[in-house]
Amino acid sequence: MSNSMTKLTELREMSDEQLDATAKEAAETLFRLRFQSQSERLNTPSEIKKNRKTIARVKTIQTERQLAQPQA
């Protein structure tokens, strides 16, 4: 995922596997940014917030999909 802030409509069109990959990639990027922010100055501090929001969006969509499935 090249764009760190993915639109909600784009995320909703993704499969479950793609959502998992997107969340994992955003979490790894967030980890690197946090580590970098402690050791040196970030060029774009807003990237931390964008990655956190992307992770939250993915988790929200995953929860919506789980709740939409019929209980078996």
From Swiss-Prot:
<dbReference type="GO" id="GO:0003735">
    <property type="term" value="F:structural constituent of ribosome"/>
</dbReference>
<dbReference type="InterPro" id="IPR001854">
    <property type="entry name" value="Ribosomal_uL29"/>
</dbReference>
<dbReference type="GO" id="GO:0006412">
    <property type="term" value="P:translation"/>
</dbReference>
<dbReference type="Pfam" id="PF00831">
    <property type="entry name" value="Ribosomal_L29"/>
</dbReference>
<keyword id="KW-0689">Ribosomal protein</keyword>
<protein>
    <recommendedName>
        <fullName>Large ribosomal subunit protein uL29</fullName>
    </recommendedName>
</protein>
<dbReference type="InterPro" id="IPR050063">
    <property type="entry name" value="Ribosomal_protein_uL29"/>
</dbReference>
<comment type="similarity">
    <text>Belongs to the universal ribosomal protein uL29 family.</text>
</comment>
<dbReference type="GO" id="GO:0022625">
    <property type="term" value="C:cytosolic large ribosomal subunit"/>
</dbReference>
<keyword id="KW-0687">Ribonucleoprotein</keyword>
<dbReference type="InterPro" id="IPR036049">
    <property type="entry name" value="Ribosomal_uL29_sf"/>
</dbReference>
